[in-house]
Amino acid sequence: MPFDELKRWESSLQNEGLINPRCRKAFHVNRLLCFGIAKSMPVFEKLILSDQIAHLRHISYMFLAFTGPYLAWELGFETWTRKDGAMPALVFKSSKYAHDQRMIRWSEIAFTKSVAKFKCAALTNVEYALLIAMIFTKPGAEGLSPEGKDLLYDESAKFTNILLRYNQRRLGLLEGVQRLDLCINLINAAIETEHILRLMLRYHTKYYSMDSIDIQCSNFIENLIKRTD
């Protein structure tokens, strides 16, 4: 992104706040990407329709919370940065949030500290691909049928074992187990990041004026918080 365009975007982002058009577009693109990856996995087609919907709702924002900091680390940035140069943390440089220590702290945890964990881990491409597969087979969605949970659990266990064997071959038996633990902690960190992002949305809707938010955006926020989209 050219510097002058980046400055215009930064100014627009700070004026429009947390739920800006670029943010909403990014969420929609993320959902499409998430659906495409899920469809490419054989286990997804084995799930009944209601399980597919519940599963996608469960993993879509965890997927964003995992890939956001990974992409920033891959691009060499210290905070969430997409390939178009967009940085969500810039929102909180706005005077609107200047004295809101809670939002600033949450922003640091979600958008900056999460990247530091990926920088420390320095995942290989194989590890990243297998962790994505583990996220897409995580059987924790509310409303999943027992059969759906079993299918996803078996698939998740398969990818976990592949990741373990991969690291044991290249690092050693004990070191491979330790590396697996570090990798799984990145998924747990993504779950924490997703939780923080939802806290930020709930807090924002409660304590900040929504007068400039249209009905479509209001519904978008509610769907994000409740996972009903």
Positions of predicted regions on the chain:
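Nuclear receptor C-terminal ligand-binding domain
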Residues: 1-229
